[in-house]
Amino acid sequence: MNTRTKKLPPLRVGIGGPVGSGKTTLLEMLCKAMRAHYDLVVITNDIYTKEDQRLLTVAEALPPERIMGVETGGCPHTAIREDASINLEAVDRMLRQFPEADIVFIESGGDNLAATFSPELSDLTIYVIDVAGGEKIPRKGGPGITKSDLLVVNKTDLAPYVGANLSIMEADTQRMRAHKPYVMGSVKSGKGLREVIDFITERGLLPPMPAQG
């Protein structure tokens, strides 16, 4: 199988999803799990603040200089799709500073089910929804659910507390996504995290990450 080498551009992974779905937590957990094996940098998007950058820095997901915050100043989906120039510029700046990067993670601001990443900006897209948002979320569809490369149905541990039926959610997810991959998990506790990592490395032509001891 072909693998990505330093001769290839870094893999750009877009992470999107509604506010509160767990995008930043997923990004934190990915960085902490993968940073010993891959050269990582992160770009976060917020409308008027750099709160997600701050959260990742406080959590020590990566060294502060490897986390860049972007203030979009408007609809967050515009900055990742219709006019991605502010993010493309941020990627260029980060890669000038870290030319050996293997992966650039780009986290969108909280957006809706219609948001998607521009193919100019992202090689792979991961869309995060959460069980607490309601059992009906998967069947609402939208490009994030139907067209993302990987769908993460997060916070499955909360299902008993919010009256959500995981079997129904999974069946709806399968129906809406046809044969596209998805993960049912709770990334804060680590459930499903390895599946996300394996998806990134396999689809991104990166060497597989060693199993955790």
UniProtKB/Swiss-Prot annotation:
- Per the UniProt entry, what are the Gene Ontology biological process annotations, in alphabetical order? urea catabolic process
In Pfam terms, one family for this protein is: cobW
List GO terms (cellular component aspect). Answer: cytoplasm
Q: Where does the UniProt annotation locate this protein?
A: Cytoplasm
NCBIfam families recorded: ureG (TIGR00101)
**Protein's name in the database:** Urease accessory protein UreG
Entry keyword Magnesium? no
Domain of life according to the entry: Bacteria
Function in brief: Facilitates the functional incorporation of the urease nickel metallocenter. This process requires GTP hydrolysis, probably effectuated by UreG.
Describe its partners and assembly state: Homodimer. UreD, UreF and UreG form a complex that acts as a GTP-hydrolysis-dependent molecular chaperone, activating the urease apoprotein by helping to assemble the nickel containing metallocenter of UreC. The UreE protein probably delivers the nickel.
InterPro entries documented for this protein: CobW/HypB/UreG_nucleotide-bd, P-loop_NTPase, UreG
What PANTHER family does the database record attribute to this sequence?
UREASE ACCESSORY PROTEIN G
Q: Which UniProt keywords apply?
A: Chaperone, Cytoplasm, GTP-binding, Nickel insertion, Nucleotide-binding
Q: Which residues bind GTP?
A: G17, P18, V19, G20, S21, G22, K23, T24
Family named by the database record: Belongs to the SIMIBI class G3E GTPase family. UreG subfamily.
Which molecular function GO terms apply here?
GTP binding; GTPase activity; nickel cation binding
Q: Report the CDD domains cross-referenced here.
A: UreG
